[in-house]
Amino acid sequence: MAKLQITLTRSVIGRPETQRKTVEALGLKKTNSSVVVEDNPAIRGQINKVKHLLTIEEEK
């Protein structure tokens, strides 16, 4: 299964609590922090909720 590298490029300051919790659930804490996660429908749904705050790259 493919992996995704997710980077938090925008701050969560001033964002609704649901978006903050979603970013935290993805494993991101600070701006410019990155995580590598499995590509599955649950992760894609979380990414879709906060896509305006993230940069997503597909790993090989």
UniProtKB/Swiss-Prot annotation:
Signal peptide: none
Annotated InterPro entries: Ribo_uL30_ferredoxin-like_sf, Ribosomal_uL30_bac-type, Ribosomal_uL30_ferredoxin-like
GO cellular component: cytosolic large ribosomal subunit
Pfam families: Ribosomal_L30
A GO MF term: structural constituent of ribosome
Family note: Belongs to the universal ribosomal protein uL30 family.
Subunit and interaction comment: Part of the 50S ribosomal subunit.
Name of the protein this chain belongs to: Large ribosomal subunit protein uL30
Protein species of origin: Staphylococcus epidermidis (strain ATCC 35984 / DSM 28319 / BCRC 17069 / CCUG 31568 / BM 3577 / RP62A)
